[in-house]
Amino acid sequence: MKFFCVAGLLASAAAFQAQPAAFTTYSPAVGGATSNVFSESSSPAHRNRRATIVMDGKANAIRDRITSVKNTKKITMAMKLVAAAKVRRAQDAVLATRPFSETLQSVFGGLIARMGGEALDLPLLTQREVSKVTLVVITGDRGLCGGYNSFMIKKAEARFNELKDQGVACDMVLIGKKGITYFQRRGYPIRKTFETGQNPDSKQALAISEELLNTYLSGESDAVELLYTKFISLIASSPSARTLIPFSASEITQQGDEVFQLTSSGGDFEVERTELEVAEPQDFPNDMIFEQDPIQIINSILPLYLNGQILRTLQESVASELAARMQSMQSASDNAGDLAKRLSTEYNRARQAAVTQEILEIVSGASALE
């Protein structure tokens, strides 16, 4: 076998010495003349001539992988832009609900101030001994959003175990497919599940608030806690927990709010957060006569307020999910670009190695004939 390999190499070298032009591809020179690859001519044909390089399987595999990585980068960039458009939509939805929310908060604050301590006897404002808690957990419906869902699930599990260690019974109301799938597979006590999608509306929030009110007023639960992801910026979000029911009159009348706005500059996205002023309680004169008893008015306002709070947290959770997806897709695009550069370098090295190997074979064959 070695003899045949050496004989083949010598035959190739002899053929190269006899007709070296046959081992190269070239373009015709001006006037139809041809030139040899070893010619010292400086004609355009000589400058445009390219040697035929036989690439090995490794180089071809690298080239195919470069193409695949570049196509993946295009997909991730498109997903980032889609997420940015949906964040703007969520932003507009939050701004659209602000006038009603501010007016409701102002009227409620005025009624609380007018009634004084009498309002604290309402069922939804009364603090009672807690023996069972309902956790409302908001997660996303899809993945590809970094640690958004996993952080929220870990927060819910930690709170569930904390209440269990304190001897407090606990069940869950789950919102979002990821959380539903996770907790159902692990056998957690689940009261009810909801799927709101990426465009939550007031009807969906109303269905959730009615379920929570019925649970609390019927005595099946002594407190309702809401776990959601607070939207901070495009690169940061915070799993948050708050007591949803019973209400705290002081929090309703004093707690501020924030509105986020997504802006773009030079192809980059930024978030501007504006802290809104607290809605001042409406001043009701002492001689004002209410057609209905103020207690009945407050009982009617509280479900509306709960509905608004749930809708707001749903919208904020959606914005956090989309922002996390934007950041995740941006990171994926950057990583794809870096990987494509490394693969291009590796491909060029493989190509250069193939050229060097061919030259060495030719030179070795020519030397063997001398």
From Swiss-Prot:
Q: Supply the alphabetized keyword list.
A: ATP synthesis, CF(1), Chloroplast, Hydrogen ion transport, Ion transport, Membrane, Plastid, Thylakoid, Transit peptide, Transport
Record localization: Plastid, Chloroplast thylakoid membrane
Indicate the residues that form the catalytic site: 145
Q: Which segment is the transit peptide? A: 1-55
UniProt cross-references to PROSITE patterns, sorted A to Z = ATPASE_GAMMA (PS00153)
Which GO molecular-function terms appear in the entry? proton-transporting ATP synthase activity, rotational mechanism
Keyword Lipoprotein tagged: no
- So which domain of life are we looking at? Eukaryota
Identify the Pfam families for this entry. ATP-synt (PF00231)
Described by its record, this protein's role is as follows: Produces ATP from ADP in the presence of a proton gradient across the membrane. The gamma chain is believed to be important in regulating ATPase activity and the flow of protons through the CF(0) complex.
The record ties this protein, via NCBIfam families, to:
ATPsyn_F1gamma, PRK05621.1-2
Q: What is its quaternary makeup?
A: F-type ATPases have 2 components, CF(1) - the catalytic core - and CF(0) - the membrane proton channel. CF(1) has five subunits: alpha(3), beta(3), gamma(1), delta(1), epsilon(1). CF(0) has four main subunits: a, b, b' and c.
What family is this?
A: Belongs to the ATPase gamma chain family.
The identity of this protein, by name, is ATP synthase gamma chain, chloroplastic
The source organism is Trieres chinensis
